[in-house]
C-alpha cells in the first residue's frame, strides 16, 4: 500500500471513490469548489493506493477562526472514504495521522469536526479528539403558531442573490461578540452559499439604510426549512429574520423550521419564547487541538463558540 498526498490529477479517482462510498456522483465543479476554491486555502488530502486502485481517502479543508480577537488558521474534518475491498484494514487512522501532521506543519491550531456515531468513538479514543458538545437541533413545529411567524413587521427583510461589502462591515461589528467562531466575512459567505454548486440557499438580510444589521441563510431539506446560518447585531434583528424564514416556510407548506444555536445566546432565548425547542437529532461536535493551549484559548469549551449548521459541511 502506498500513502501519499492528493493532488489535482487525482480528482477522477477521488470522485469515483466518492460515488462508490456514498452512492452519488460528485461533479468536477463540486470537488473544485470544496477542495481548491475555498477562501482559506486548498484542502489537505491524503490517499492510500493499492497499485492503481484508490483504497482510501481523508481530507481536511482550511477554515479561518476568530479566537479571542485574533484570526487563526484551523481546519474542518470531512470526506472520509474507504473502498469496500479495503475496509477493516485500519487505513483511516493512518491517513488521519498523516493529514493532521500536515495541518500542524501548516500552522493550523485545531481541526474541528462533526463525526457520526460510527466514527466518533475512534476519533476520541484513538486519535486524540475532544468532545466539545452534543449539539441538539433547535426546531419550531409551527402548527398553531403560524400566525406568530407571519411576516408582519419585517418589511425591511429583503432577499438577496449575493453578498456585498455591507457584509464585511457587519462582520467587523460582531466578530468579537463570541470568543470563538468561524470568520464570516463577505468572501467566505459568497463562497459558502452563493457559489455552492450543489445546494441552493436563500439569503435574507435586514437592511437598515445603507447597512445590513443581520442575515439569515435558509435551505429547504425535505419537509423542513433549515436556518443554516444567522448573524446579527442584536437578538431583535435575529428574531425578525427567523420570522421571515418561518413565514416563507409556511407559504411552502413546510411545518418545521430548524437550526443550531448556542444556548448561551440571547437570540436562542428569544427564539425559545417564539416556540423553538431543542431535540433530536443530536450532532457530535469535537475538536483536535494541534497547538499549545495558549493559542486555543477556550476553543474546547462550547460556551465560547458561535456555531451554526453552516460550520458543518453537511448542510
PLM regions with names:
Residues 8, 61-65, 80-82, 115-118, ...:
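An acidic- and aromatic-residue-enriched active-site/binding cleft used to recognize and process polar
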Residues 12-50, 104-106, 120-121, 125-229:
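Amide-forming acyltransferase catalytic core, primarily the GNAT-like/NAT-type
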Residues 46, 56-58, 75, 80, ...:
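Conserved GNAT-family N-acetyltransferase fold
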Residues 50-55, 59-68, 217-223:
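Acetyl-CoA-dependent GNAT
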Residues 71-84, 223-234:
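Conserved acetyl-CoA binding element of GNAT-fold acetyltransferases
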Residues 82, 87-101, 235-247:
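Conserved acetyl-CoA-binding loop-helix of GNAT-fold acetyltransferases
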Residues 85-88, 94-118, 122-124:
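Membrane-interface helix-loop-helix junctions at boundaries between adjacent transmembrane segments
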Residues 110-151, 215, 219-236, 243-315:
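Active-site/acyl-donor-binding loops of N-acyltransferases
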